[in-house]
Amino acid sequence: EIREHEFVAQTLLSKLSDLGETIRHPREIMDLGPLVHYHSAIDVELGKKETIDRLVSLLHPTPALGPLPRTSETLADLISWRHRLGCPLWFGSPFGLFQDGACEILVAIRMVHWLGKKVSVPSGCGVIEESRLVSEWRELRLKRESVRSMFGV
């Protein structure tokens, strides 16, 4: 899982480095109860003013949520497969706060979707060449169980 995290962090670092000076902070472990989640903060000192649309297009989807390499063709394939499988087209998004000339953005990779009395908790896992199927299924189960336990179901 560290390797999957590094794919995401390195991809974001590469995309953001075109905007200005970047600093990647040491990888940390976030304890989320039954889940362990890796977190790597990246600071960017923008060389010029950027639009929110530009920042979002660089951040989303990360390889944790979409294909790598991310091209218009691979994104179209992903959307097509999700549509055919009845999956949500997206289940994560950048979220940010702009204040006093500074911006803090994170990329949320979890989702809970309510529609009437129905609640959906889509989840996925990263699949890279070194992935082991048993570990990926376990990761999916733990993600879903953690959300269920938060809601007491």
What is the meaning of each model-derived region?
Residues 70-153:
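Glycine-rich, small/acidic residue-mixed loop/short-helix segments
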Residues 1-81, 152:
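Contiguous alpha-helical scaffold segments within structured protein domains
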